From Swiss-Prot:
Name this polypeptide is given: WD repeat-containing protein 72
PANTHER family: RABCONNECTIN-3B, ISOFORM A (PTHR44099), WD REPEAT-CONTAINING PROTEIN 72 (PTHR44099:SF2)
InterPro entries linked: WD40/YVTN_repeat-like_dom_sf (IPR015943), WD40_repeat_CS (IPR019775), WD40_repeat_dom_sf (IPR036322), WD40_rpt (IPR001680), WDR7/72 (IPR049916)
Highest taxon listed in the record's lineage: Eukaryota
Species assigned in the record: Pongo abelii (Sumatran orangutan)
């Protein structure tokens, strides 16, 4: 699993919808957590002054969130658990926003209680769950596996609500109320052993409460006697000893109660569905206990409520509220009532310690203490919340933002295509658009970045599709767009011409899909158009014709499948029915429902089902947190309805599509528009492109040292002269641009027969392996060098804490990276199904940040402390590799960027690595050789490349310098301290940059800051000398790694090479032969290396 996906959110000026369905305050009273109908969780900062600010959105559920609860002892592990309507459960670390565990069970939970008895239980405790199933489930809080269940001996039923009775005087018990109004009690303390032994555990007591629709049950911990039970139309107070009724209060004015809490002895708080709340004092009635009722029992002392206070609330009966109460156990010991609305608003009331009524006895009104919405964050930080195409689009609505209704990113062309509400389509370079949006000097990027505007639609553009991204056999210039008027246009995006218009005569086109490669009709793949009126149309692009119009579906289309043998189109609908269409004739062959429909769909399950077929990088296919929002408006690309699944060529894409270091994800917030875009930086892939391949990772079945020698062989074939540059120091590292130059990777190895031939004047190499019948070569991978290095610089610009000190100018001068316009919203893909994004103004409640670092791109105050600890661990001689005084500044700049990215990857991998694995990896790295007095930059980067390969592949064969062992231990410890990945990365980056800038004080620097206009030309001029350095480093790699059989004196070269030396170098690929040795994978070495290596051989 790739864990190096960093993200930057470009939100736009309108906040995404967040319809609150669940709310809680964490035990440390520093954070509010809300779950939404859209499936996302939101973390809100809560200050000691009870000020609120939205901090982070967590993407992990594909359905509406039903409940939230703590999942650990919060003082030890800040974990909470969330449950969704479709049975998904996630355990989150709310400190760093990462999902630590996820499971999907066939249960819909409506309430969860955490229980742990330290002296009787092992593990992390239990999650006691109730919902739309019988009785109570017991789920392991760590693994989310079902451990056992509490069963009912009589009248098993669904459970509406529950609470845990925990007291030092009595045993722990679980109290529940069923949908039929049955109160049941299970003993927890005495049931632990029985549950661990999988024995049935039944209730010890039950009582019918004579009311329905129970909302809340609460035990009074102050008196350990009263029991509050809130129903929708009344609330009651019982004596916990024998469950006798003490009080009944019926709702008035048509209000429906939603919950309640015991806030003090004989004092309760009740709230309603429309957000009103009331505080009552329970008073004794004064009835004598000597009065006996007719049945002979002793009459219990009865009580009656006295209304003390009520809370002020805006009258809005159309917005249901979810509410809760928190009694702070830490200073300043606030009692807080909180609510969340479907509109996304959070409101807090500070409940006084001693609520009192007015002098005339009427209830006193408690004012609202704080209220906040996501939009408030966006309004206060409008510069942070700009859209990615604001600089390029002249299309503005009243709010000043581009009205984008659909969006598509083409990684192979680095083009972002945005369809707008007025029918125009904007095409721009995505990386340039991101730089213009985020970096200072964006106007220069805007002026130098061409963009196109396509005009052809008369209605809003609702869907886009780039067919070549799904099948390389289709024309690279084709693009499809659909609109509200049921018109689909085939474009040539290079010439901006309209090739054809398809008029479907149906509803708005909500999704454009493509058949898999195995399904072809008339020699070509088919385009499937799904419309909002439940109709489906098939288009033949080559023939410019519409093959099928299927209009008889009664429910929204949920699934599209293809039958390649009989040319059938299989359409699955939301009611689980199936329609089978014959494509050639356009007739409906069959219509099935129920079990037959499920069988038909399962029989066609031979290819991958996905939510969307839009061409995105494979890592974004793995991180499906945004694609798979089945019941929410958060979807990647326009989908026809929640949960649409199509059988497509994405299985083929997964095999053919190579991950790229930079991607753009459009995220839908409504069916008709794109709310924001996410920039994805694949740190692992970026390091792969920039670091040299470690020699230990070279497959013996491949040609000599892979792609670099292939390139050299090609240059020999083309009769290009190879030159070596004279240098006093050891050969330097590969430059970033040179390494990122487009090359073709060798085919995938394994049990296949791999042959490589490069023929010129008899030059031929061949390596044979075990023969296999099936051969699936790895796809060719071409990466633009300038795009790679620009991506690396933009990534570093986004992470550097600009404005912390006076090093900004030095970073711009020596690293040639531009400063950010302001703080940005960072994010992280923590798991294959989970994603977290910071919101604009996430640090509003952090008074220290506002006071000391206002407007600084500092992730948290903790970053500076972590950076100091990291710097203290660094030995004096360890830092960014130097020794490049004789090289041009552009090469030093590239080497520094390579080194910084490799360090960031190391940090990212270690922080995400499990502790036991990190310890095992750390113990496997030991000192293998004595450091030279003068450290070579090439050796540093090769060491990092070797260690990177170990972390990526899980091997323990590589070695790092001893100095890195202490850093490895330090970074591994950060995981246990709930340090966020972005915090750790920013801290290490800042420490390394500071070390580098300090070292530059001893090195003469002749470079000047490069302007944006000169940046591109400068990088192009640097390519040629860096290619020469690549040759030099390759020979240095051989010298450092492969010991010679016989000592050979170094050969000195003049700057003017004679013809004999040139001929030797031209013939060198012919001599780069790995002969079979007695030890598998161990090459024999030849003395010819010394003839071409300008460095001293030791």
């Amino acid at each position: 699993m790739r864990t190096s996906l960093q993200a930057v959110a470009l939100w736009g000026q309108k906040a995404p919808p967040h319809s609150i369905t669940a709310i809680m305050i964490t035990d440390d009273q520093r954070m509010i957590v809300t779950g939404s109908q859209e499936g996302q969780l939101c973390l809100w900062n809560l200050s000691h002054e009870l000020k609120i600010s939205a901090k982070e959105l967590l993407f992990g559920h594909s359905a509406s969130v039903t409940c939230l609860a703590r999942a650990r002892d919060f003082s030890k592990q800040p974990y909470i658990v969330s449950a969704a309507e479709n049975g998904e459960m996630c355990v989150w670390n709310v400190t760093n926003g990462q999902c630590v565990e996820k499971a999907t069970l066939p249960y819909r939970h409506t309430a969860i209680c955490y229980y742990h008895c330290s002296f009787r239980m092992t593990g992390e405790g239990w999650l006691l769950c109730c919902g739309e199933y019988q009785d109570v489930l017991i789920i392991d809080a760590k693994t989310l596996a079902v451990v056992h269940s509490f069963r009912s001996s009589q009248f098993p039923d669904w459970i509406n609500c529950m609470c845990i009775v925990h007291s030092m005087r009595i045993q722990d018990s679980l109290l529940v109320v069923s949908v039929a109004g049955e109160l049941k009690v299970w003993d927890l303390s005495s049931s632990i052993n029985s549950i661990q032994e999988k024995q049935d555990v039944y209730e010890k007591e039950s009582k019918f409460l004579e009311s329905l629709n129970c909302q809340t049950i609460r035990f009074c911990t102050y008196t350990e006697r009263l029991l509050l039970v809130v129903f929708s139309k009344c609330w009651k107070v019982y004596d916990y000893c024998d469950f006798s009724l003490l009080l009944t209060e019926v709702s008035r004015n048509g209000q429906f109660f939603a919950g309640g809490e015991v806030i003090a002895a004989h004092r309760i708080l009740i709230w309603t569905e429309d957000g009103h709340s009331y505080i009552y004092q329970l008073l004794n009635s004064g009835l004598s206990k000597s009065i006996y009722p007719a049945d002979g029992r002793v009459l219990k002392e009865t009580i009656y409520p006295h209304l003390l206070c009520s809370t002020s609330v805006q009258e809005n009966k159309n917005r249901p509220f979810v509410m809760g109460y928190m009694n702070e156990r830490k200073e300043p010991f606030y009692k807080v009532l909180f609510s969340g609305e479907v509109s996304g608003r959070i409101t807090l009331w500070h409940i006084p310690d001693v609520p009192v009524s007015k002098f005339d006895g009427s209830p006193r009104e408690i004012p609202v203490t704080a209220t906040w919405t996501l939009q408030d964050n966006f309004d206060k930080h409008d510069t942070v919340s700009q859209s990615i195409i604001d600089y390029f689009s002249g299309l503005k609505d009243g709010a000043g933002t581009a009205v984008v209704t659909s969006s598509e990113y083409i990684p192979s062309l680095d083009k972002l295509i945005c369809g707008c509400e007025d029918g125009t389509i904007i095409i721009t370079q995505a990386l340039n658009a991101a730089k213009a949006r985020l970096l200072e000097g964006g106007s220069l990027v805007k002026d130098s970045s061409p963009h196109k505007v396509l005009k052809g639609h008369h209605q809003s553009v609702t869907s886009l599709l780039y067919p070549h991204g799904l099948s390389s056999k289709l024309d690279q210039s084709w693009m499809l767009s659909g609109d509200l008027d049921s018109c689909v246009i085939l474009w040539d995006i290079f010439t901006e011409e309209i090739l054809h218009k398809f008029f479907l005569e149906a509803g708005p086109v909500t999704s454009l899909l493509m058949s898999p490669e195995k399904f072809k009709l008339r020699g070509a793949q088919i385009i499937c158009c799904v419309c909002s009126d439940h109709s489906v149309a098939l288009l033949h692009l080559e023939g410019r014709s519409c093959l099928l119009r299927a209009r008889k579906h009664l429910f929204p289309v949920k699934m599209i499948k293809w039958h390649p043998v009989e040319n059938f189109l299989i359409v699955g609908c939301a009611d689980d029915s199936v329609y089978i269409w014959e494509i050639e004739t356009g007739t409906l062959e069959r219509h099935e429902t129920g079990e037959r429909a499920r069988i038909i769909l399962n029989c066609c399950d031979d290819s991958q089902l996905v939510k969307s077929v839009f061409p995105i990088a494979s890592e974004t296919l793995k991180h499906k947190s945004i694609e798979q929002r089945s019941s929410s408006p958060y979807q990647l690309g326009p989908l026809p309805c929640p949960g649409l699944q199509v059988e497509s060529s994405c299985k083929v894409i997964d095999a053919k599509f190579c991950p790229r270091p930079f991607n753009v994800l459009p995220v839908k917030t409504k069916w008709s528009n794109v709310g924001f875009h996410i920039l994805l930086f694949d740190l692992e892939n970026l390091v792969e492109l920039l670091l040299p391949t470690p020699l230990s990772d070279v497959d013996s079945s491949s040609s000599f040292y892979g792609g670099e020698v292939l390139r050299r062989a090609k240059s020999t074939v083309e009769k290009k002269t190879l030159t070596l540059r004279k240098s006093k120091t050891a050969c330097g590292p590969l430059s970033a641009e040179a390494l990122a130059k487009p090359i073709t990777e060798s085919p995938a190895q394994g049990d296949n027969t791999i042959k490589f031939s490069a023929e010129n004047d008899g030059i031929k190499r061949q390596k044979k392996m075990k023969i296999s019948k099936k051969m699936q070569p790895k796809p060719s991978r071409k990466v633009d060098a300038s795009l790679t290095i620009d991506t690396a610089k933009l990534f570093l610009s986004c992470l550097l804490p600009w404005g912390v000190d006076d090093l900004d100018y030095l970073c711009i001068k020596h690293l040639n990276i531009l400063k950010l316009q302001g703080p940005i919203s960072l994010g992280f893909a923590s798991n294959e199904d989970n994603f977290s994004l910071m919101l604009p103004g996430w640090d509003l409640c952090n008074t220290e940040m506002i006071k000391d670092y206002s407007g600084v791109n500092l992730f948290s105050r903790k970053v500076l402390d972590l950076s100091d600890k990291y710097t203290a661990t660094l030995p004096n001689q360890v830092g960014i590799p130097r020794g490049l005084e004789n090289n041009c500044d552009s090469l030093q700049e590239s080497d520094t960027i390579v080194y910084l990215l490799s360090r960031l990857f190391l940090v990212n991998k270690l922080v995400n690595m499990p502790l036991e694995l990190a310890c095992r990896v750390g113990s496997s790295f030991r000192m293998e050789c004595v450091h030279n007095k003068v450290r070579s930059a090439g050796n540093d980067i090769l060491n990092m490349s070797s260690f990177y390969s170990c972390l990526r592949n899980g091997k323990n064969e590589s070695h790092v310098p001893e100095a890195d062992l202490s850093l490895l231990k330090l970074i591994s410890c950060w995981r246990d301290q709930s340090v966020q990945v972005t915090e750790a990365i920013q801290a290490v980056l800042w420490a390394e940059v500071q070390q580098h800038m300090k070292s530059l004080g001893k090195i003469p620097v002749n470079s000047q800051p490069v302007s944006m206009a000169e940046n591109g030309n400068c990088e192009m001029k640097q390519m040629l000398p860096k290619l020469e350095w690549t040759e030099e480093l390759e020979l240095q790699c051989i010298r450092n790694t492969l010991p010679l059989q016989t000592p050979v004196s170094p050969v000195k070269h003049d700057s003017n090479l004679n013809s004999a030396n040139i001929q030797d170098m031209e013939d060198m690929p012919d001599r780069c032969v790995l002969e079979e040795s007695e030890s598998p994978g161990e090459p024999r070495h030849h003395s010819w290396i010394a003839k071409v290596c300008p460095c001293k051989v030791s």
